[in-house]
């Protein structure tokens, strides 16, 4: 792992990393997030009785859309031609929470970690948005990179 911030130049200014000379390689990243809620809120989601519709389907689509828009949200991210985005949601009633996982892939010159993290985060935010009328004290937590493959820095897995 590097001990240098690649997005800070010699003058200490933020800049977009030049990836022109980097090789095109297959890259993928997996991320997760959790949203904790009351058991009654989770049951409403699981039973499909939420008045706004299918919470998981909406959150999944939001996560996919967010991955595609990451460079619009995070200033120094490169716009990427993603070849796969997957968002999965798993109700965990024993913990009164939903686990969101995301997978992003491409063949390119830069990694997809931020896209995977953005997908998981926005899916969690979408669940919050859809359920806030029922419960306002839900907690989004543990947003993290689970794994990344490809590129110069190699393989990382928690």
From Swiss-Prot:
One of its GO terms (molecular function) is cyclic pyranopterin monophosphate synthase activity. Belongs to the MoaC family. Keywords: Lyase, Molybdenum cofactor biosynthesis. HAMAP family: MoaC_B. It catalyses: (8S)-3',8-cyclo-7,8-dihydroguanosine 5'-triphosphate = cyclic pyranopterin phosphate + diphosphate. Catalyzes the conversion of (8S)-3',8-cyclo-7,8-dihydroguanosine 5'-triphosphate to cyclic pyranopterin monophosphate (cPMP). Its EC number is 4.6.1.17. This is Cyclic pyranopterin monophosphate synthase. The keyword Endoplasmic reticulum does not apply. NCBIfam families: moaC, PRK09364.1. Pathway: Cofactor biosynthesis; molybdopterin biosynthesis. It comes from the Bacteria. GO terms for biological process: Mo-molybdopterin cofactor biosynthetic process. Coiled coil: none annotated. The active site is at 129. Homohexamer; trimer of dimers. Substrate binds at residues 76-78, 114-115. The keyword Lyase applies.
